[in-house]
């Protein structure tokens, strides 16, 4: 469960030891998340762990002041606090910086925050939220700033947990922000730095958010092979039929491709390269691989693959979310095309 992930050091993998973390590299954390995905059958939990590590905590590690880090990182690492990352709004999704949430500067240097954030992982249960809002309405990306917002402040309302197709164990919902008064120290970086902060974090998140799913794909492949070897039809294990064997071979191909694209992104990050291309490709390949392989696993399992009491059906539902979160696959193909000079 969540607390077990904290107790075993997973949540603090990249956090400095002075805050209770393990001080490991992003590449090492990728391997940790992949192993977690292989060993844990709760894909919602593994996604939630990766989400907090690669968003809220990463913002604190890279952009937080010493005071901000000391206030929040120990609790996030030991599991006593939960962090969320609130960029999306009802009318602001792929067009990320078309925000209606505003943060008006007060005479004392603080800010008054108003707006509605939608579809937020951990939104209904978070203790701390990284909120993006416009401090210069009409200035687009250049007017966006980022804030650390404790959810126990007056005016912060956490919405109900929303039902969704997959990853149902991850709380997901909205945040209402009504005249929330923030002290000056809530600002992350400088005013107007929100777009650069978001772009830096989202490239890392896209690169590695599928690490648990790559581990889950390995588990899925192993289970499908075992089923195909033991399930007999026509006097033979179904693994001996070419149609079944080819589906399993394709699952292996996709798993290796997804893993290699994630590792390639990790190498790019370690070198200090710009991540946008590697991140986009890693997410596209891993997402498509997860969906296609889940469909193949469902077909090989026959009726079992269509029933909710078996893991196969849940894996397919869970995989579908990847088409949307951390940047839709279609939009990321536009990003790749633009970087190639054809979009």
Identify the meaning behind each predicted range.
Residues 1-40, 49, 63-68, 75, ...:
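Alpha-helical interface subdomain recognition
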Residues 54-63:
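Helix-loop "lid/cap" segments that line or gate small-molecule binding pockets
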Residues 78-87:
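A short, Trp-centered hydrophobic/proline-enriched beta-strand micro-motif
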Residues 91-94, 119-122, 136-138, 164-171:
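Short Gly/Pro-enriched turn/cap motifs at secondary-structure boundaries
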Residues 98, 152-183:
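Flexible, small-/acidic-enriched active-site or ligand-binding loops
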Residues 101-104:
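A structural signal for short hydrophobic beta-strand segments in well-ordered beta-sheet cores
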Residues 110, 114-158:
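A short core secondary-structure module
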Residues 173-200:
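A short, charged helix-loop
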């Amino acid at each position: 469960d969540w607390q077990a992930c904290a107790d075993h050091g997973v949540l603090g993998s990249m956090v400095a030891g002075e805050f209770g973390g393990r001080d490991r590299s992003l590449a090492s954390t990728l391997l940790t998340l992949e192993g977690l995905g292989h060993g844990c059958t709760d894909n919602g939990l593994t996604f939630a762990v990766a989400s907090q590590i690669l968003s809220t905590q990463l913002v604190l590690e890279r952009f937080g002041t010493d005071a901000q880090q000391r206030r929040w990182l120990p609790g996030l690492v030991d599991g006593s606090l939960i962090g969320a990352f609130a960029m999306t709004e009802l009318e602001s999704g792929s067009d990320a910086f078309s925000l209606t949430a505003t943060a008006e500067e007060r005479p004392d240097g603080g800010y008054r925050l108003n707006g509605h954030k939608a579809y937020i992982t951990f939104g209904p249960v978070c203790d701390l939220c990284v909120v993006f809002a416009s401090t210069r309405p009409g200035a687009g990306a250049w007017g966006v700033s980022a804030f650390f917002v404790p959810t126990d402040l007056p005016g912060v309302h956490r919405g109900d947990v929303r039902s969704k197709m997959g990853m149902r164990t991850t709380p997901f919902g909205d945040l209402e922000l009504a005249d929330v008064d923030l002290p000056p120290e809530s600002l992350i970086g400088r005013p107007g730095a929100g777009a650069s902060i978001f772009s830096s974090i989202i490239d890392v998140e896209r690169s590695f958010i599928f690490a648990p799913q790559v581990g889950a794909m390995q588990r899925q492949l192993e289970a499908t092979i075992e089923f195909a070897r033991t399930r007999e039809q026509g006097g033979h294990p179904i693994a001996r039929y070419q149609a079944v064997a080819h589906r399993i071979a394709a699952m292996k191909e996709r798993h290796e491709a997804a893993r290699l694209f994630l590792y390639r992104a990790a190498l790019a990050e370690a070198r200090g390269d710009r991540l946008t291309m590697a991140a986009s490709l890693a997410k596209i390949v891993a997402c498509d691989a997860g969906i296609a392989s889940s469909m193949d696993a469902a077909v090989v399992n026959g009726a079992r693959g269509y029933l909710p009491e078996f893991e196969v059906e849940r894996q397919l539902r869970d995989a579908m979310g990847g088409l949307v979160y951390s940047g839709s696959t279609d939009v990321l193909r536009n990003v790749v095309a633009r970087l190639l000079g054809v979009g």
